[in-house]
């Protein structure tokens, strides 16, 4: 949902001819079809760059370079965060190919509030149109922009671990947003 709404806001601000959707699956990911659908809906060009083989090669090379006495093998959390960092490096390479374009960060206030992002991964970017918006507000904007309901309200996940964001963090975004409003605004 965040990428969908950030892309729509960029189209509103800049025009569809100045926005490019970049999909970076790690092998086969079922949510790539949704990303292509939103690119069509927004009439923006898109690229698909599969990072799966790069990810596998990097994991292998890191394991081979490891010193068994001082370095553990690639633990699950390291492997979970690595694709986000590969994606960000890829986005900046693509941006450089398009007359030094800018990379959009899709993190929202709710994620930032609890530190739910990968350093130098999905938390990076040149500007952050959603950074001061809770998930509830992001959803409202998506609805106001007339974006497809199923893409705006789909269950958020990283697309890699097989778990939803809420399963990973242990509470719902609705609960988190209520807490943020209570603490920040004293409601």
What spans do the regions from the language model cover?
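Short, intrinsically disordered, charge-balanced linker/junction segments flanking boundaries
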Residues: 184-187
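Catalytic subdomain that performs nucleotidyl-dependent activation
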Residues: 76-79, 83-85, 99-175, 181
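ATP-dependent adenylation/nucleotidyltransferase module used to activate substrates
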Residues: 1-113
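Charged/polar, solvent-exposed surface patches and flexible loops
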Residues: 37, 53-60, 140, 153, ...
């Amino acid at each position: 949902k965040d990428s969908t709404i950030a892309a729509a806001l960029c189209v509103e601000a800049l025009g569809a001819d100045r926005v490019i959707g970049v999909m970076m699956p790690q092998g086969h990911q079922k949510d790539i079809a949704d990303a292509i659908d939103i690119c069509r809906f927004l009439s923006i060009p898109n690229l698909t760059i599969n990072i799966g083989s790069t990810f596998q090669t990097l994991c292998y090379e890191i394991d081979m370079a490891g010193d068994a006495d001082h370095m553990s093998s690639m633990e699950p959390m390291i492997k979970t965060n690595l694709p986000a960092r590969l994606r960000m490096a890829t986005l900046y390479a693509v941006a450089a190919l398009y007359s030094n374009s800018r990379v959009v960060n899709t993190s929202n206030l709710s994620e930032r509030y609890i530190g739910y992002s990968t350093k130098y991964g999905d938390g990076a970017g040149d500007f952050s149109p959603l950074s001061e918006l809770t998930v509830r507000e992001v959803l409202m904007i998506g609805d106001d922009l007339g974006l497809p309901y199923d893409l705006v309200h789909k269950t958020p996940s990283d697309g890699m671990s097989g778990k939803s964001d809420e399963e990973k963090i242990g509470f719902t975004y609705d609960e988190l947003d209520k807490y943020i409003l209570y603490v920040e605004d004293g409601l």
